[in-house]
């Protein structure tokens, strides 16, 4: 007999405004407990120093979290010129202090050099793993691990404020871009060094900034539910976004329910008007029920790639 999961079955995505000072996994575990969810996962770690958008996926939505991991990100960052730290942020120790002789024109010219596709070597103080361990664990032990450079794209990087030794910027970038590394490299270009003092992720994919909620707000709703003796899900679940919001950027292929049944049993189908190639978001019927993602095979058919398992099917299998 299958081991029963602890927690309730719930599917969807919630946009958490991660506070500073805790890890992304700590954030995930707190929210998972509040929702009493049986299954949950985050979509890419934020540094403890960083705040902002952290999409968390529940239940079947975890199947599509990779699309959020691979999506574009937006950040607001404040850097302090004149000081380098061993972590490239204010959590580390100052290892070098230099005089700052920078004007706005020079700063803007250097910032412009980061736009476009370049190679970036990840920071040792990152969550990137080497032999199963995050790089920052090696760094804390004083061990330097060789890292391969990776292609990143900075779609835009704009100077918002330059006051004294503080530089504030907005960055729109591809996955895997380390803002601390950009800041460190900028400091070297300017000849004075720099480190991050504030970092906030303001966007993941096309999720609305205003849809973010704090852990404190969720805890307040949970307390209210207990106080008023109502089910917590009545207050918490309306904050969830649909599971297909993680793949909303994919082209939709809507099919009649008969074809959807074939797809849900693993069979490719011919759908009029489907794209000629690529990955697609599959929906069924007039209500456009999300059933999973598929790809266009060599015969031009829509073939299942990752399917939603509906709750009634789960219950039947028990």
Curated annotation (Swiss-Prot):
Active site: 47
Biological processes, Gene Ontology terms: mRNA pseudouridine synthesis; tRNA pseudouridine synthesis
Enzyme Commission number(s) from the entry: 5.4.99.25
This protein's record includes keyword Protein biosynthesis: no
Enzyme class: isomerase
Reactions catalysed, as given in the entry: uridine(55) in tRNA = pseudouridine(55) in tRNA
Matches recorded under Pfam families: TruB-C_2, TruB_C_2, TruB_N
Sample GO molecular function, one term: tRNA pseudouridine(55) synthase activity
Keyword field: Isomerase, tRNA processing
Gene3D superfamilies xref list: Pseudouridine synthase, PUA domain
UniProt cross-references to InterPro entries, sorted A to Z: PsdUridine_synth_cat_dom_sf, PsdUridine_synth_N, PUA-like_sf, PUA_sf, tRNA_psdUridine_synth_TruB, tRNA_sdUridine_synth_fam1_C, TruB_C
Annotated function: Responsible for synthesis of pseudouridine from uracil-55 in the psi GC loop of transfer RNAs.
Similarity comment text for this entry: Belongs to the pseudouridine synthase TruB family. Type 1 subfamily.
Protein name: tRNA pseudouridine synthase B
Protein species of origin: Aliivibrio salmonicida (strain LFI1238) (Vibrio salmonicida (strain LFI1238))
Taxonomy of the source species: Bacteria, Pseudomonadati, Pseudomonadota, Gammaproteobacteria, Vibrionales
